[in-house]
Amino acid sequence: MSISNGWSSSSIISDVLPEEEFEEVEEDELILNENDRLKFRVDELEKIVVAQRNEILLLQSSTVEILRRLQNLEIQDQSRSPTCSGYSSLPRRISGSKSSYTMSPSHAPPRSSHANSKSLYINGMNNNSEEVSPGPPRHRPPTRGSDGMVNVSVGKSARGSPMRKWVSTHDMKDTDRFRRLSTSSEASTSATMNPIVNSVRRLSTTHRQSSPSLLSLCSVISRSPSTSSILRKNNRTCQFSNGSGHLPIFIGGKTVQVPVPTGYENMDPTMDQDPPTMKVTLKHVYSYRGKDVRSNIEMLPTGELVFFSANLVVLMNITGEDRSQRIYHGHTCDVKCITLHPNKILVASGQSSCHSVEKFQKPEHTSPIDSPEDLVRQLEMEHTEAHVRIWDTIKLTTLMVLNGFEKGICHVAFSKTDSGSLLAVVDDSLKHLMSVWNWQKGKREGEVKASNDVVFECKWHPTIRNLIVLYGKGHFSFFNYDPATGVLVKTVATFEGRDKPKTVLSMCFGENDQVVTGDSNGTISIWDPRTCKTTKQAHSVHPGGVYSLTLAKSGKILSGGKDRMVSEWDLQDLVRTRRPIELPDEKGFPRVILQNGSELIIGTSSNTLLFGNIENSTNLTSLIEGDPGNLTFLLTCSSNQLITSSQCGTLRIWNHIDKKVEFSKKFIDSVECVDVDVTNTHIILGFAAGLWIVMNITKQQTIQEKKEGTAPITAVKFAPSGATFAVATKDPHLTIYRIDASKNLLVIARIHHIPAPIVALDFSSDSQYLRGQSIGAHLLFWTKAGEICDGTSVKDVKWGSSRVKIGFETALVAHSSNGQVTAVAQCEDISACGMENGTIRIYKNPVTSVTAGFVELLGHGRIIKSVAFSNKIQLFSCSPTDNSVFEWCLE
């Protein structure tokens, strides 16, 4: 074949490449194409397998629930008259792909027209918004006297397969009150619902024992979806013999004999125990996440500062002295980012994923749901995949939920030039996908692979239409979005010169369309977004890197670096215009800077929020005090003090009435454990290097200190007598000390031959006995002199504290959760149990049933390290991994 100029195509190819090389290139291209096609087919097959597995689980749970309900109806039918048959109320399955709930269809939650989004309601928005209409269901009407069933769309899971819910997950109470509520209530998540609290009562033992093999298949839905670590249910039966005097519990395949006090010899662990009657609210959040995320604070026109901690988004009033808070409870896992809509009313927040098919288990059955609000709240709790929520800051109500993400949301941004109709979302997955959404419709308009490495932020340009700027580890790019086709065209920005930075760390926009970046070399660069080239640079202005940039109200740029300096720059000449502000060393370096008039708000790498005036930089105060290291302990002291410690060696004593830190001290080593004496005047600290210190709190003086060895201190505990205390190490061994009136240290007993390191200690109320729990779930007893005691001899001993998690008071909780209790506190007739999945359970004290009801508190995203009562109506909790500290009010 010839081309127009007379040259054959074969001759041209032979001139450019030898024939052998051309064949090799062609073969390589064919192999690459085949690999791409094969990878695509494997991905599609994986999605099909996951979808089919979900369908199998759905069918199993549905079948089991039908059999269980049929059996219950037969029992009821036998106990009633022959004419009073209950089969007419049995729900009928309409479709295998729909989720059904026996509730009135008059106000069904609206089904989104897009499979990867869920709209709870959109009220009071513009003309494009969707409204809830009480229209009839779109499926075939139910028969045989049923009150009606409503199909509720719950979006897609992280892998794209539909998350279908069947009636076995949520038992709907068929009462007149429910039907009345369902016709008059709007199903929406609002602040008045208090979605952080759930009262749980497990099913009766007749239901549990009727068919164990079938009921085990019912447990397919997680009770606590706001976690990455789902609780494991203990399937072994707890059998208590009246004459034995010991309660055998099973933890991790091991049997633990727990002594039973006098008066409980005839208890039946299989009988029900009601939950305590109380109203629980989250009163205050003492923590802020700032060390590992960007775009974590926003300012509202109302004077409220928006930030997040664990699963919660907090709106704090910083204009008054009370520092009051409002809290949005919509998320079920760690919040990773927030952004403010141009109308200054709406907020979009993204969370990470804790959704896994393998971990999708339901540890307990719950009591029937008796209102549409409870149903919607329960569905929201089970929304465990990564998603974005758009919500109203006035009513704290959710407007839209965007689904279809994998690992987590690392950044969200509203468009600026079109009144915020578009939302850019970056998925923190291996593919690092950036998608553009018409969020009011819940529709994904476009998607592109953002980069090959971690993405830090994406922002819409405030003046250039449809331009997105994105940066991260080893990349900095401009994306032009075409609304007509949904195509995103990428242009990579390149640094000129030899000293190219490894990472762009921060970015903001100037007044004249400029894009300003800060990088790991400590350089501030000004870019032309049209040519994607630098126009001006200031080198090495922040040694260690420029971690934060923001445009001030005056048109100048504020920058913060790893040198803990905050500087102001003139964009015209890129020179400093005032003396830099230096942050204290213990506060960390700036990660985000926000200016509100002359006021300056700085979020630092130590999870601290600073507030001050740019004109008076010496007067910086802390809105939130934090630590870069994980929290290690929390306990209450006196009636108004709270003590926290961390791995970075910081000890803080808070006044929880004024919400301020009264005393703070930094130690070289990590503080592993803490305790305070009965007079609230002395505190003992155990460190990771084997050192312990006894301090006087009021005088802030060290009374005694000693190094036990090189092994970490694992537990410390004061006796109620005050002068006696115990110290346990990881060796393992245990030593009991006493400080006399002359402040001399006396050794009372040294206890060796301990099977595993002690992690919790309790003294008896008379200071004569000591009990301990080891890492291997051993329950051990000693006298004050160090002699080993039999459990029978101490069964009636009154214990002065409750740090041991497998004592009689909460042993059945440890059994039913298979040892997933991580913290325990007691106050009069109630017990608080912190769980490995981040939830807190409030039980009646003592817990005498494996099916005991409890009130569940949600908010923490990870394992609970400590819970502590200040009084019967005030509870504190902390989680080490997300550094969250919460105050709860129990009424």
Curated annotation (Swiss-Prot):
GO biological process: microtubule cytoskeleton organization
GO MF term set: microtubule binding
Gene3D superfamilies to which the protein is assigned, alphabetical: YVTN repeat-like/Quinoprotein amine dehydrogenase
Record's keyword annotation contains Signal: no
Comp. bias (Polar residues): 77-88, 118-131
Region (Disordered) residue spans: 77-167
Subcellular location(s) per record: Cytoplasm, Cytoskeleton
Cellular component, GO, one term: microtubule
WD repeat feature ranges: 330-401, 404-447, 499-537, 541-579, 626-664, 708-747, 753-792, 816-853, 859-890
Pfam families cross-referenced by the UniProt entry: Beta-prop_EML, Beta-prop_EML_2, HELP
Protein's UniProt keywords contain Protein biosynthesis: no
Keywords linked to the UniProt accession: Cytoplasm, Cytoskeleton, Microtubule, Repeat, WD repeat
Bias kind Low complexity: ranges: 104-117
InterPro entries named in the record: Beta-prop_EML-like_2nd, Beta-prop_EML_1st, Elp-1-like_TD, HELP, Quinoprotein_ADH-like_sf, WD40/YVTN_repeat-like_dom_sf, WD40_rpt, WD_repeat_EMAP
Signal sequence annotation: none
Family of this protein: Belongs to the WD repeat EMAP family.
Role according to the record: May modify the assembly dynamics of microtubules, such that microtubules are slightly longer, but more dynamic.
Protein name: Echinoderm microtubule-associated protein-like elp-1
Organism of derivation: Caenorhabditis elegans
Name of the gene encoding the protein in the UniProt record: elp-1
